[in-house]
Amino acid sequence: MRRSGVQCPTRHEPPESRRFPTMFNPSRDDVRRFFTETWRKQRAGEILTPLEAIAADWIVEHPEYHDELADADGAAARNYTPEEGRTNPFLHLSMHLAISEQLSIDQPPGIRAAHDKLAAKLDSTHDAQHAIMECLGETIWEAQRTNTPPDTDAYLQRILRRASRD
């Protein structure tokens, strides 16, 4: 018997603790709204949340995206296809945020040191992030291709190989 307000998992429902909250699985519109609103707030000099501040720093580093991010309605409707030959700014900025978070908590362990080595080699933290982004993309692609979780050891090794190349 179920009590009011208490969810008991069944064979067909995973327990609530195994479901991801919406904040970990935002929709395309949520992501676009986050970046366009962050850019609007940055330009207006409004107070930013810590995550918005990190996003705003990356947006500032990418002036090629400023006009698109300033057009919230257009950004919400725009599609980015490989045939256009344009980078999806929302995907690109989301990857910057993901890598920034990985570096802040050193997860996977060793990524911060690998990043620092790569940044020193490239003489640019921004270029290091772009190189790591390629490694992350390859790792995600491999996981999707093999229908397995991302291999964090292989991800870290890709970054270290990048840092060691002549």
Language-model region placement:
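Aromatic-anchored, charged helix-turn/loop surface patch used as a conserved interaction hotspot
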Residues: 51-119
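N-terminal leader/targeting peptides and immediately adjacent processing regions
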Residues: 19-66
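Glycine-rich, aromatic-bearing surface loops/beta-hairpins
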Residues: 141, 145-166
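Amphipathic alpha-helical protein-interaction segments
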Residues: 119, 131, 136-137, 141-144
